[in-house]
Amino acid sequence: MNANEFVHATPKEIGKDTVVITASQRGNTAETVKATAVANELGAATVGLTFQVPSPLSDTAQYVIQYEFGPESVVENQKVSYGFKLALEILNEEEGYEKYDEMVQALAKLNDIVVQAKKDIVPDAIKWAWEFKDDSVIYTMGSGACWGPAHQEAICIFMEMQWINASVIHSGEFFHGPFEITDKNTAFLMMKSCGHTRPLDDRALDFIKKFNNRIFVLDASQYGINELGELAEYLEPMFYNNVIGVFNNLIADARKHPLTTRRYMWKFPY
C-alpha cells in the first residue's frame, strides 16, 4: 500500500493485533515515516526496513531491519527479501505453512541463481540497451508477482532515473485497452512469469509479435529460476529486481545519463 494513502485512508483494521511493515532506502521518505508514526499511534507493531541507520525511519519504527543494497548484496538480505521473509514468518507462526522449510531453502538458493543469471544475461542486455536507448516511451509488462518489478522499472528507472516516459501494463489488462497502442515501433519490456499467470503473458506476447518486433522478453525460466520448482513464482520478484540492474546500468551508459541524475528529487521541498 502506498505510504501516503495509508496516512490519509488508514485501513480500519490497523490496531494492536496488526504488524505494519514500512520501507525507505535512505530512511527519510517523509510519507513513509509519517505512515509508521500513524501505525504506532494506533497501537500496531511497526517494522522499518531501511538501508540507512540511523535515520528518521529507524528512529520511528519499533523494530528496524537494515538491509543490504548494491550489486554485491546478497539477495536474501535485500529489502524485498526481508519483506517477504517477515510475511513468511508471520504466516508460519499464525497459521502454519507446510512448505516453510522448502521456501527458506529456496530463498537461500536464489542468490546463486541470480549471480549466474547476471553473467549470462549480459549479451542480451547490451543488445537491448543499444536498441532501446533512443526510445522516448517504453512500456513495461508483467503479471502475477512479476507485475511489481515491471511497475518499479517503469516509475523508478525509466521515469525517475532516465527521464523516459513509461507506463506499466498488466498482461491481463492488455486487451482491455492498451493493445491499441501497439505498432511496429512501440517499445515493450516484459518480465515474464514462470507461474500461474504465464498464460496471460503468452497471450499478450502472441498478439504483440503479430504487429511488433520491438518487445524484449526477460524470462526467468531461461536463467535457472525453475530450479526452485513450484516455489519459483513466489521468488521471481527478487530475481527480476536484481537481474534488471544489468540492463539499467547499460542503458544509462548508452544514453550517457547516469542513474543518479535528478531534476527535482532531493533538490527542494515538495
Segments and roles (model prediction):
Residues 148-215:
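Internal helical hairpin/lid segments
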Residues 1-100, 191-221:
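Glycine-rich phosphate-binding loops that contact phosphosugars or nucleotide phosphates
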Residues 106-108, 216-220, 237:
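Aromatic-enriched
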Residues 71, 88-169, 175, 263-270:
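Active-site phosphate/pyrophosphate-binding segments
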Residues 16-17, 134-135, 185:
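Phosphate-coordination loops involved in phosphoryl transfer and adenosine-cofactor binding
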